[in-house]
Amino acid sequence: MGAKKNLLAELREKSSEELDEFIRDNKKALFALRAEAALQNKVVKTHQFSLYKKSIARALTIKQEKKDRVHG
């Protein structure tokens, strides 16, 4: 649970541009993992799919919170 809190704290400290970069990097990594799973017959660590998706969702949530704080 501590690792998740550290990630959230780090994400909250980032600027909007840094959050965009974090989201882009995680989406690229998720795409690469999906491509690897589809194109190769080797075992892929399937738990990484959900880890990437959750990281993306957390970053998008924090980005929306920052946007609401500025406009709301």
From Swiss-Prot:
PROSITE patterns documented for this protein: RIBOSOMAL_L29
GO terms of molecular function: structural constituent of ribosome
InterPro entries membership: Ribosomal_protein_uL29, Ribosomal_uL29, Ribosomal_uL29_CS, Ribosomal_uL29_sf
The keyword Ion transport is annotated on this UniProt entry: no
Gene Ontology cellular component terms for the protein in this record: cytosolic large ribosomal subunit
GO terms, biological process: translation
Keywords assigned by UniProt, alphabetized: Ribonucleoprotein, Ribosomal protein
Nuclease keyword on record: no
Family the UniProt entry places it in: Belongs to the universal ribosomal protein uL29 family.
PANTHER family xrefs: 60S RIBOSOMAL PROTEIN L35/50S RIBOSOMAL PROTEIN L29, LARGE RIBOSOMAL SUBUNIT PROTEIN UL29C
Protein name: Large ribosomal subunit protein uL29
Organism: Chlamydia trachomatis serovar D (strain ATCC VR-885 / DSM 19411 / UW-3/Cx)
Gene: rpmC
